[in-house]
């Protein structure tokens, strides 16, 4: 009996090993990892700049599509736009699932966000509502809030220019609340810190393989005080931030509505448009969730883009001078331009905004798609439930498409006559995601950066800091290495271009 049992176990092991070997031969190439269940490439996963490691692995294995298995989670990496387009765009119905993360969705409470909702009717309903209001056609209805935030940013920079980073974060947050809920935001409002905390947690938890609980969901039942359960303590703090980010502005808007003091906003307009004969609780839940999308985009990604714009102007003063020459030709020196002709009247500034989203790729790996059924691509098996990461950093730093990709060069998008060159790939598509899961806030984000850039360079020369002898100090163009990418902290000076504009803006 014992011999029979041992034989059966041995036969099972041999069968498992052979089946695994046969299946692995059908998968895309990738690093071998440790051939044990729930281990695989877990210890290969980079915690910093994973997009660089994935690109290097692609070169090592001579492929633009990689397979990894991190703790039982199957991962596909796409390193070229061709592969990304073939799968995420052309086969979008199969690749529109989303990461179902125990850490992010359950423990941190991000189930409200479109980026983490499972593909289905709820996702379609919420995305349809948000995308309609924030489409390219409708985005101008929010321009007053964008201009107001840009002008207020200038006033804050005149008073305390050394706090420029905090001022950007505050004004982008204030704009988001104005658009989403029609409410004001004090400079020291705790909502800002809560939003920043929630977004920082999301950035850390979104790195592939960053928390074991995503591979072993049963770990979520561990007591938070237990050694090794630090992830639960982190999740608790991050969830408090996310809950405050979602609920505070919505409840404030509702109170103002009852008092008759609410200003027009996305949320108030949606509430007024609710079907009185429908499920009111459900309709309000959809409005609450979609209004939060304005905060999520403004709370981190737009702040990163505006900060990168300032960094680029400091590092590339010749670009700054050319933008200012374009602005001055449209109006006069020190006069903030009319924003009705965003793309046509200031093509070089528009090219700068395109280059910002390429040069400072905010989400280098985007948010992963999940395959809803087995697929075959180029003869490779792409397994059901695999997480599919598009390496946008690789796409936007492709030297064949963007020569000298580490350099900030807006002119790459313009022809010799200074007009947009349609033959150059617009980087904003890759910067804002792919297929049915692309970011519906793209038009709000890019117009916010455009207006902020035009306003800042109309009023200021943005210059390098100086040492004790008045000599300019060079600053490096360095960026964070987490899932969401930002410029590392740096110093700069905001020097008013004319006394007249200084008096005008201050007044």
Curated annotation (Swiss-Prot):
Pathway: Secondary metabolite biosynthesis. Keywords: Heme, Iron, Metal-binding, Monooxygenase, Oxidoreductase, Signal. It catalyses: tryptamine + AH2 + O2 = 4-hydroxytryptamine + A + H2O. The keyword Metal-binding applies. Its EC number is 1.14.99.59. Gene3D superfamilies: Cytochrome P450 (1.10.630.10). Heme binds at residue 439. GO terms for molecular function: heme binding; iron ion binding; oxidoreductase activity, acting on paired donors, with incorporation or reduction of molecular oxygen; tryptamine 4-monooxygenase activity. Residues 403-425 are annotated as: Disordered. Its cofactor is heme. Belongs to the cytochrome P450 family. Tryptamine 4-monooxygenase; part of the gene cluster that mediates the biosynthesis of psilocybin, a psychotropic tryptamine-derived natural product. The first step in the pathway is the decarboxylation of L-tryptophan to tryptamine by the decarboxylase psiD. PsiD does not decarboxylate phenylalanine, tyrosine, or 5-hydroxy- L -tryptophan (5-HTP). 4-hydroxy-L-tryptophan is accepted as substrate by psiD as well. The cytochrome P450 monooxygenase psiH then converts tryptamine to 4-hydroxytryptamine. PANTHER family: P450, PUTATIVE (EUROFUNG)-RELATED (PTHR46300:SF7), P450, PUTATIVE (EUROFUNG)-RELATED-RELATED (PTHR46300). This is Tryptamine 4-monooxygenase. It comes from Psilocybe cyanescens. The gene is psiH.
């Amino acid at each position: 009996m014992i011999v029979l049992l041992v034989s059966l176990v041995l036969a099972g092991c041999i069968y498992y090993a052979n089946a695994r070997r046969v299946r692995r031969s059908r998968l895309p190439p990738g690093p071998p990892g440790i051939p044990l269940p729930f281990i695989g490439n877990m210890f290969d996963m980079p915690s910093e700049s994973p997009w660089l490691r994935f690109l290097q692995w692609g070169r090592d294995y001579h492929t633009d599509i990689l397979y990894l298995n991190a703790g039982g989670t199957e991962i596909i990496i796409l390193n070229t736009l061709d592969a990304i387009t073939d799968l995420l765009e052309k086969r979008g119905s199969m690749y529109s699932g989303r990461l179902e993360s125990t850490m992010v969705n359950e423990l941190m409470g991000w189930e409200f966000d479109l980026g983490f909702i499972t593909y289905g009717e709820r996702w379609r309903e919420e995305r349809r509502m948000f995308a309609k209001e924030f489409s390219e056609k409708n985005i101008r209805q929010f321009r007053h809030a964008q201009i107001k935030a840009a002008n207020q940013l200038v006033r804050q920079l005149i008073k305390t220019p050394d706090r420029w980073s905090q001022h950007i974060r505050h004004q982008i947050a204030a704009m988001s609340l104005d658009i989403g809920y029609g409410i004001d935001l004090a400079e020291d409002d705790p909502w800002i810190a809560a939003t920043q905390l929630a977004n920082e947690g999301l950035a850390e938890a979104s790195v592939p393989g960053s928390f074991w609980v995503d591979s072993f969901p049963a770990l979520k039942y561990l007591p938070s005080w237990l050694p090794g359960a630090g992830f639960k303590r982190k999740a608790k703090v991050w969830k408090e931030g996310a809950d405050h980010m979602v609920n505070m502005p919505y409840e404030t808007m509702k109170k103002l509505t009852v008092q008759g003091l609410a200003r027009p906003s996305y949320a108030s307009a949606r509430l007024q448009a609710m079907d009185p004969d429908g499920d009111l609780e459900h309709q309000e839940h959809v409005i609450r969730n979609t209004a939060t999308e304005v905060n999520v985009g403004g709370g981190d990604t737009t702040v990163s883009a505006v900060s990168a714009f300032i960094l680029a102007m400091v590092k590339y003063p010749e670009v700054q001078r050319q933008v200012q020459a374009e602005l001055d030709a449209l109006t006069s020196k020190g006069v903030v331009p009319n924003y009705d002709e965003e793309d046509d009247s200031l093509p070089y500034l528009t090219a700068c905004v395109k280059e910002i989203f390429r040069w400072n790729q905010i989400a280098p790996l985007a948010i992963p798609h999940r395959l809803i059924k087995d697929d075959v691509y180029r003869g490779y098996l792409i397994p059901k439930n695999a997480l599919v990461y598009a390496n946008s950093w690789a796409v936007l730093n492709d030297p064949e498409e963007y020569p000298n990709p580490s350099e900030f060069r807006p002119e790459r998008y313009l022809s010799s006559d200074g007009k947009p060159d349609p033959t150059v790939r617009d980087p904003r598509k890759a910067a804002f995601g792919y297929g049915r899961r692309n970011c519906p806030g793209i038009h709000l984000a890019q117009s916010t950066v455009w207006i902020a850039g035009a306003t800042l360079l109309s009023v200021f020369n943005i210059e390098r800091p100086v040492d004790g002898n008045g000599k300019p100090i060079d600053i490096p163009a360095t960026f964070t290495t987490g899932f969401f990418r930002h410029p590392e902290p740096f110093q700069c000076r905001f020097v008013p271009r004319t006394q007249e504009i200084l008096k005008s803006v201050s007044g």
